[in-house]
């Protein structure tokens, strides 16, 4: 008779202990998992997305969760089991919770776990990391808001809409292909310190939501769709702007693809990855959009051209800080796999000041934009950067080497989105 599996993990699911029964049930030697993997490795990805959070909440609320589910052994074999989960505490239940203990017993029953449509939708969002596309879409809206605010009939509405969808699909393709190349390099597999939903890639391959080959196929399909939309945009673009649109688009695709793809793998080249993100999510995207939607010859209108360039600078800088702060928890695994970004190059302690410098540059560049436009309303997003950005930096400064840093990671993402939305609104007036 197979022994019961007993496994303990911390609050983030990282495996801390496992008994002999766990090795027998799941087929992994404990040396391969303890301190290196998370308990999600035992479950099908869709069950992780749909059920696990509910199990843990019930365990915390009632002191125990008991249920039946499917698990996966190291050899890929699926089996049916009874699972019992309890919260764990360091020194008694009156102290803060430290993790969970799970007891798994193999059962001779046919267990079917129905997967909801909403879970399948979440699966698609997870594989493509769609929620992060706001970083590329909001700069497009900012350019549209600028042209709408300074005059009438300055831009092609149809091309504006096509740009939104084209950039959206292109961003998704880059996300998926980045996961593919990180999978080949072993970067995401090596990473056990990631912050859930923030750093460490989508985890879609690691959770079994999609295969490595599947990411390659999906990324290729999305790229082709983006190119078709881009071709349509060109047919509607002012002929005087076509060359600029093609040049900027090719530059963006080049940077997006070779961000993680060999032989360039820009993310591993000590600052070139961060520069890539700044350009791709900043001036390139705002200038590309401006050339694509402007009804006249944009190169002959230096005022509009430079203003669209300036709009992209703070947005690109803030997106760069999202990347930078997400490199903190990933530093160890990235270093082990040769992903030599700025945090690996300078270390966590020194990289705090890089974050602050980028933040201050975003403040200054927004001030330059406000001065050029004569728009005092842009002082509102500047104030946001100073106040909220200052708070986030204080968290980073103190918590840079702890799991509590996740507050600053989410804060940086939120700040970039709110800033871009605020800029869009102020540019309309």
Task: Go through the PLM ranges and name each one.
Residues 32-46:
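PAS-family sensory/regulatory domains
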Residues 192-236, 340-374:
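Multi-pass membrane catalytic core of lipid/isoprenoid biosynthesis enzymes
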Residues 22-33:
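PAS/PAS-like sensory domain cap-loop motif
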Residues 19-22, 339:
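N-terminal capping loop/helix in small sensory signaling domains highlighted by a polar->aromatic N-x2-3-F motif
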Residues 45-77:
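Terminal output helix/cap of sensory domains in signal transduction proteins
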Residues 15-16:
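Conserved hydrophobic beta-strand signature of PAS-family and PAS-like sensory domains
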Residues 201-297:
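Intramembrane alpha-helical segments
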Residues 83-101:
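Short loop/turn elements at sensory-signaling interfaces that couple input to output
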